């Protein structure tokens, strides 16, 4: 798929100009591919581990003979938790480094910032994070969960547990706001009261006002779409306010195994999380993935949904 898509869409004669302008070189024994993940900033806790999964997958693809006999050369960039930097790095990878495809992006804001780069150059982005839908592009492979695969099942579960009211909280960008719009529509159709809704800037560490409002609202549960380092601050304030999972559980959309390590497992006892993948998935393929990852990076390391999605995306290039 990578070598077939270098600069042109299969069967798309209208893309011939873009193909002629492409600087991707497939004449040698290697093909360059890129990775853009936040290795610094507030999202590094969630994104840096995704780079590890991508690196492992590239090594495995190369060990098995590469793509159409060509080894992959990985060029990595730091998105620094800023959408504008993601766009700048995407342009560098496509126009200067001449990569055949890019793996990366985390927030919907970073994906949307990069989208014009890939469409204008007719290049490929493999986006492995969950996303809100409402967008499609022939230049993006969306390999993460959509809302009907993550948000709706989590709401169904809360409803089954007798939840009659929710407080919505999220980081302030596209995915959390769109997710909560879906939550509100679901709530209206299912007789669930929305007690409140608040957003905080990416990277925010002050949740005192929001958590105080949550505590006062006394909802049955919290629907949480906060991401990155902000999760640590949110749960720290949640505990400081005397809230517990038994009193007001938190259903999180962006807390996976790596975030549990960062926040601390004792803080998250009996809390809820919704993902398409967990490290404990009992299949031969996952056991191999987890074993290979730990063999490379250490027995104490964990795998998560975004990591698995990125890892799988690289292997789809074979």
Regions found by a protein language model. Name each.
Residues 1-32, 63:
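Short, low-complexity disordered leader/linker segments with a strong preference
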Residues 19-21, 45-52, 65-133, 201-204:
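Beta-alpha junction/loop-to-helix N-cap segments that form part of ligand/metal-binding clefts
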Residues 19-27, 31-53, 77-84, 106, ...:
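Extracytoplasmic "Venus flytrap"
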Residues 31-33, 52-73, 188-192:
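Signal peptide-proximal N-terminal region
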Residues 39, 140-202, 221:
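An alpha-beta-alpha
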Residues 86, 143-166, 177-178, 205-208, ...:
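Hydrophobic alpha-helical segments within soluble ligand-binding/sensing domains
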Residues 93-105, 126-128, 167-170, 218-228, ...:
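Periplasmic-binding protein-like
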Residues 238-311:
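Extracellular/periplasmic periplasmic-binding protein-like sensory domains
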């Amino acid at each position: 798929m990578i070598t077939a898509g270098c600069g042109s869409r299969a069967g798309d004669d209208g893309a011939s100009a873009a193909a002629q302008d492409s600087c991707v070189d497939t004449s040698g024994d290697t093909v360059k591919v890129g990775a853009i993940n936040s290795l610094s900033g507030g999202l590094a806790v969630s994104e840096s581990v995704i780079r590890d999964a991508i690196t492992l997958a590239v090594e495995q693809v190369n060990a098995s003979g590469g793509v159409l006999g060509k080894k992959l050369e990985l060029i990595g960039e730091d998105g620094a938790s800023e959408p504008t930097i993601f766009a700048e790095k995407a342009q560098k990878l496509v126009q200067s480094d001449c990569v055949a495809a890019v793996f990366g992006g985390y927030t919907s804001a970073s994906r949307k910032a990069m989208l014009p780069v890939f469409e204008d150059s007719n290049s490929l982005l493999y986006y492995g994070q969950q996303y809100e839908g409402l967008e499609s592009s022939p230049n993006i492979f969306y390999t993460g969960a959509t809302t009907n695969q993550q948000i709706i099942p989590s709401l169904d579960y809360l409803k089954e547990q007798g939840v009659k009211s929710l407080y919505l909280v999220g980081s302030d960008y596209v995915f959390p706001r769109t997710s909560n719009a879906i939550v509100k529509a679901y709530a209206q159709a299912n007789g669930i009261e929305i007690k409140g809704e608040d957003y905080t800037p990416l990277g925010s560490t002050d949740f005192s006002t929001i958590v105080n409002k949550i505590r006062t609202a006394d909802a049955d549960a919290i629907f949480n779409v906060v991401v990155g380092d902000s999760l640590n601050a949110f749960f720290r304030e949640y505990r400081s306010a005397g809230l517990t999972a038994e009193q007001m559980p938190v259903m999180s959309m962006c807390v996976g195994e790596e975030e549990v390590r960062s926040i601390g497992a004792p803080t998250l006892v009996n809390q809820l999380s919704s993902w398409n993948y967990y490290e404990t998935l009992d299949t031969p393929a996952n056991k191999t993935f987890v074993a290979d990852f730990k063999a490379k990076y250490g027995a104490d390391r964990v795998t998560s949904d975004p990591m698995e999605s990125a890892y799988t995306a690289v292997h789809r290039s074979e």
